[in-house]
């Protein structure tokens, strides 16, 4: 049996925070605002995984009203989600992600992101695709107000 999940997330830029995307710290003058470390890509992947097994979203499992998740490492949150997915008897078929950002350029960091995500999801890097695009200076990402991401995951029963 196969299950497909889709995820989407957006975070706003802010001064004085590190920029963490896909579990990788990226040099940039701004970071993203969030209750956790605001890793927009790992949040998107977690939502896609939870959606594939009809288990809600990360807000349900890790609410931003809970102080326990303040400044949480999104890699740890994704590992918890992935553990739950595996408990339900699923393994990863493949994951396809898109980061939507005007700046910074993501291309130099894509392979590091793929490697980190493959480690978190306990799978071959060949099952992980990460790509990036701009919005040609349109919308909030084009105005460099924040970053968005999308992901689609295919899970298969073990």
Swiss-Prot record:
Metal-binding in keyword set: yes
Signal peptide annotation: none
UniProt cofactor(s): a divalent metal cation
Cofactor details (free text): Binds 1 divalent metal cation per subunit.
Any one Gene Ontology BP term: isopentenyl diphosphate biosynthetic process, methylerythritol 4-phosphate pathway
Positions bearing the site annotation: Transition state stabilizer: 35, 134
MF terms in GO: 2-C-methyl-D-erythritol 2,4-cyclodiphosphate synthase activity; metal ion binding
Pfam families tied to this protein: YgbB
EC top class named in words: lyase
PROSITE patterns: ISPF
Catalytic function, reaction form: 4-CDP-2-C-methyl-D-erythritol 2-phosphate = 2-C-methyl-D-erythritol 2,4-cyclic diphosphate + CMP
Record's keyword annotation contains Metal-binding: yes
E.C. code: 4.6.1.12
Cysteine disulfide partners in this protein: none
Binding site for 4-CDP-2-C-methyl-D-erythritol 2-phosphate: 9-11, 35-36, 57-59, 62-66, 101-107, 133-136, 140, 143
CDD domains assigned: MECDP_synthase
Pathway annotation from the record: Isoprenoid biosynthesis; isopentenyl diphosphate biosynthesis via DXP pathway; isopentenyl diphosphate from 1-deoxy-D-xylulose 5-phosphate: step 4/6
The entry's keywords: Isoprene biosynthesis, Lyase, Metal-binding
Amino-acid positions noted as binding a divalent metal cation in the UniProt annotation, renumbered to this chain: 9, 11, 43
Oligomeric and partner information: Homotrimer.
Family from the record: Belongs to the IspF family.
PANTHER family reported in the protein's UniProt record: 2-C-METHYL-D-ERYTHRITOL 2,4-CYCLODIPHOSPHATE SYNTHASE, CHLOROPLASTIC
Function: Involved in the biosynthesis of isopentenyl diphosphate (IPP) and dimethylallyl diphosphate (DMAPP), two major building blocks of isoprenoid compounds. Catalyzes the conversion of 4-diphosphocytidyl-2-C-methyl-D-erythritol 2-phosphate (CDP-ME2P) to 2-C-methyl-D-erythritol 2,4-cyclodiphosphate (ME-CPP) with a corresponding release of cytidine 5-monophosphate (CMP).
Identification of the protein by name: 2-C-methyl-D-erythritol 2,4-cyclodiphosphate synthase
Organism (species): Bacillus cereus (strain B4264)
């Amino acid at each position: 049996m196969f299950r497909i999940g889709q995820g989407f997330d957006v975070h706003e830029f802010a001064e004085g925070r590190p920029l963490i995307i896909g579990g990788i710290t990226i040099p940039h003058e701004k970071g993203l605002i969030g209750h956790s470390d605001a890793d927009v890509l790992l949040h998107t992947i977690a939502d896609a995984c939870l959606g594939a097994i009809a288990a809600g979203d990360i807000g349900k499992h890790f609410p931003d009203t809970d102080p326990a998740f303040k400044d949480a490492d999104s890699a740890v949150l994704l590992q918890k989600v992935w553990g739950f997915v595996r408990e339900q008897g699923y393994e990863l078929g493949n994951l396809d992600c898109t980061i939507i950002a005007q700046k910074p350029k993501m291309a130099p960091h894509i392979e590091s992101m793929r490697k980190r995500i493959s480690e978190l999801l306990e799978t071959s890097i060949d099952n992980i695709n990460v790509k990036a695009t701009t919005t040609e200076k349109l919308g909030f990402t084009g105005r460099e107000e924040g970053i968005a991401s999308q992901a689609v995951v295919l899970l298969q029963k073990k």
